[in-house]
A protein has these predicted regions:
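Conserved Walker
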Residues: 15
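Conserved glycine(s) of the Walker
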Residues: 12
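Conserved substrate/cofactor phosphate-moiety recognition/catalytic segment
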Residues: 18-61
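Hydrophobic anchor at the beta1->P-loop junction of P-loop NTPases
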Residues: 5
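NTP-dependent small-molecule kinase module
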Residues: 144-175
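Glycine-rich phosphate-binding loop used to anchor ATP phosphates in small-molecule kinases
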Residues: 53-106
């Protein structure tokens, strides 16, 4: 079983992946690690700010890792924001039967009411060396983009609108 966890910045993707790994003893792969490894080793001229280009660059590798794990009957959680909204087109039905998808989105109201709290969790799993881009407007825009992408592509999503833990709690039973 493959579990894709995606969503906007600061929605808790890595934290959820970590909690699921601990509960189910399933490894997780973080697309940010692949991104930074490729950037720091100069295998690409892309920068961490090149979101769409990074999706185009990282998705083929991520996709084939998922297929390989399914073929080997292995479970894996793949976490990151570089999973395209049309990801399903890249998998035959035999693969799709073995893939679950979670997209975390926060409502504008939630962001407005909890922005300081959101920022306080920014490094709860991984240390963010530079979090200057995490502004109220950027977080709102990023979440709106992910929510619209899910709606337009008929993908399920988890909307965090009131209480974070009550929105995330059901996802702990997805596998």
């Amino acid at each position: 079983m493959i579990l894709f966890i995606t969503g906007a910045t600061h929605t808790g993707k890595t934290r959820l992946a970590q909690k699921l790994m601990e509960k189910y003893k399933i490894p997780y792969f973080c697309q940010d690690h692949l991104k930074m490894g490729l950037i720091r080793s100069h295998y690409t001229d892309l920068t961490p700010d090149d979101d769409q280009e990074l999706t185009d660059y990282l998705w083929p590798v991520t996709r084939e890792m998922a297929k390989t794990a399914i073929e080997n009957k292995q479970n894996m959680i793949i976490e990151g924001c570089y999973i395209p909204f049309d990801w399903q087109k890249d998998f035959d039905e035999e693969y799709l039967r073995n893939i679950r998808y979670i997209c975390l989105c926060m409502s504008g109201r939630y962001i407005d009411n909890h922005f300081d709290h959101i920022r306080s969790f920014a490094s709860c799993i991984e240390n963010r060396l530079d979090d200057d881009y995490c502004t109220l407007q950027n977080v709102r825009n990023d979440n709106r983009m992910f929510l619209n992408g899910c709606i337009q592509n008929h993908l399920d999503y988890t909307l965090i609108d009131d209480d974070y833990e009550s929105a995330i709690s059901p996802l702990m039973h997805i596998l």
